[in-house]
Amino acid sequence: MGFSQEDESEKPEAAWENPVLVIVRGIKYNESYKMLTGGICMGSYLHPGNDAFEVALNSEIYVDKTGLLTYTNKVMNTLQGYICNSRPRRFGKSFAANMLAAYYSKGCDSRKMFSGLAISQTADFEKHLNQYDVIHLDIQWFLSNVSDPEQIVAYITKCTLAELRTIYADQLPPEVSTDPDALSRIKEATGQKFVIIIDELDVLIRDEASNQKIQDDYINFLRGMFKGTEPTKYIQLAFLTGILPIKKLKT
């Protein structure tokens, strides 16, 4: 799939060798969908907010991990910008995904949150702060909210396409039925690329290991999103999290 695999070293730098993000810059916004000042639309998957990161900041113990953002800023729009953070539970993977969404997403204003943290001292802090259309998918959440696990890929696709169409309706006619096709068409029509964040990437591989249909559908979804030449045209940055090493996902 082309993702870098994280070194299991305890070095701080090595702990963030695997982020995956897809960012989209919106051109046209549906008036009925505006939820924030300034005309920016905040959704569940496209243009996520910063609430989850705010909870982490308000916690009794908070460790500044914004050095990860220095790295992702550096590798954005390069072959190194496909990152998979594979680590055991409780290693802060979801925290990292929420931090990336809060920093990059156009759907929120996170200046005060990051002020005083390490990233705010870097030269390109302002350049990337809340400048992108981020797609943030939590696969565990989708699995918990679908009645039939065999429909999860269709459910993910339905939800993301619905939000993409609120902004890119002119670029996405009714016949567009997959996320990769939608992102490719948007890039071709507008020149905009995406930051994609996928949390709990491997939950279906672990929890539905005995269901071959789910496995096949999901692997094909991931291949369509990230494998080959076409995704490099519409992906600005990708950050994926999971427990299993990426090589075990059979992609």
Where are the language model's segments positioned?
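Phosphate-binding site recognition
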Residues: 15-17, 23-251
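Intrinsically disordered, low-complexity segments enriched in serine/proline and basic residues
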Residues: 3-21
